Amino acid sequence: MMGALQQQSNGHGHGVLLLAEAGYAEVDPTGRYGRFNEILGKGSSKIVYRGFDEWRGVEVAWNQVRLRDVVRGGGELERFYGEVHLLAALRHRGIVRLHAYWVDAPRRALNFVTELFVSGTLRQYRERHRRVSAAAVRRWCAQILDGLAYLHAHSPPIIHRDLKCDNIFVNGNQGEVKIGDLGLAAFRRGGGHARCVGTPEFMAPEVYDESYDELADVYSFGMCVLEMVTLDYPYSECSNPIQIYKRVISGIKPAALYRVSDPVVRQFIERCLAPAARRPAARELLDDPFLLPLEDDGFFSGDGGDGHGGFGVGYYNLMYNYLHQPACIDDHHACSNGGLSPSNSVGDNDVDAAVQRGDDDGDNWLRDIHMLFDEDDDDAAAADANERVGGVDITIKGRRTDDGGVYLGLRIADKNGTGRGRIICFRFDTEADTAMTVAAEMVAELDITDHEVTRIAQLIDGKVAALVPGWRPGPATDDDDDDDLVGGGDDPDAPGGAAAACCKNCRPAASSSSSCGSLVDFMSSAAAAERHGCRRCAELHGRFEEITFQADDDEEEQHLQGSSSDTGGSNHEQHAMGKDKEVMNINGIAQDGTVQGSEQP
């Protein structure tokens, strides 16, 4: 396929018409890239237009830099062009990809085409999303530093010279940030002498003296972190560049820095803003305590940058999972699982953080049940019910909270078959549940072998009876569960029959004083509802949290997985990464510090 410019120069005189039909205002010398008049961004010396790559069929960013302020003559133009040629060879996950570049000498402009980021710049993204966790800011910082370290590792080092949040670009759907706007980047010259270029608020003191190296980028990065944390532009208290210049060369830090009350965050920023002789390199900053995973993360919302505000990441993940239950099909189903458990499995570190903050027992039950299976007390183990069926060990443990709640955990280990095991944790309602309904619900939603249902129910009965004195087990199993169905039973044409509304939670509003059946009603009727074809509630609700592990004889290596009974039992297990390193995936974030990408829907 020929590009627009290639068609223009084919000698048939139709070039102008073809260019107009494509809607381009300009094309590159090869005819591959076309520029539209739509402006995506504008800086002091650069304008970014929306462009199109005809060969790949994707939109790109067409950057146009005016060289009249940075190019003095033909010799410097050639030298600058050579540097840009080397920049085109940069390939790093933290650097915006440069696809093509060329100098338009008659117009004294440098054009370069880069990948397009639909989420815009980090400054725009942060303004749109004013409340983000400290963990998110740390991940952004780590990616930016990684990109800077890559630039500075070249020989000679590449200095960005204009690093700021406006020149850092975001892929919001993947949580990735990349350093862009390399139009002013330069190689460090011998003796450290260079031109004074950049944005005054982000320029290091030595830049004003025109004697700087790659550490000037680290200073600019520190100002970026300050803006990320406080949502304030550095030196916003100043009204003109002269005031900024006087403060910078006098060593006066931005006023926003003194509103950062978190000592770790503030110390990290101050390290970046230190005098050049004491300023660490980008690679060194990657080991700073601020970038290490913490058990308790706060939030940065521009309210002083304290990074706390009363909520930690454990609480946040618990509440996020609790609130983001799958929506019901009908309006009268606008209810979640009532807080019996989060919708996604919560990692140990999340729940540990909740324990350290002193949350109530209702938030800690998953961790407590999990810990019961780690106990080595022989007497305690002997007191728990155990069963071995066809090479499968089944153990049940539980506890009763001060408010009377009963929480159980069922450990199923197949030592003769796949060698895999699972711990299923759930809450048992002694006033509404029976062991058989819960066991049937578990089998239906978690794909447990049918022949184990009766034995599972017996184990549940025995454990609940041990935890709740005077509690009487319910009936083993019969058709009584069908009484939970509304109307004409199996007759789909009967009023209120299965076809119309086969369980209490799905019945029409007219059949009840409440438009949504109680959660207890649903929990006790879900299994029966599924047998009668009502898959809406059975698939969209659930109480079970599941932990998988490798069932070894003497040792278990457990791996949390982000699934619950809400997913209909579709589990994706994480395999062992070795005894010395175990990676958990919580809310799409690998806990070893890496960020996992996700496919767009």
UniProtKB/Swiss-Prot annotation:
Alphabetized PANTHER family for the sequence: SERINE/THREONINE-PROTEIN KINASE WNK WITH NO LYSINE -RELATED
EC number from the UniProt entry: 2.7.11.1
Protein name: Probable serine/threonine-protein kinase WNK3
Comp. bias intervals (Acidic residues): 477-493
Annotated Polar residues bias: 560-571
Entry's Gene Ontology molecular function annotations: ATP binding; protein serine kinase activity; protein serine/threonine kinase activity
Organism: Oryza sativa subsp. japonica (Rice)
Gene from which the chain derives: WNK3
UniProt: ATP binding residues: 114-117, 164
Regions of compositional bias (Basic and acidic residues) in chain numbering: 572-583
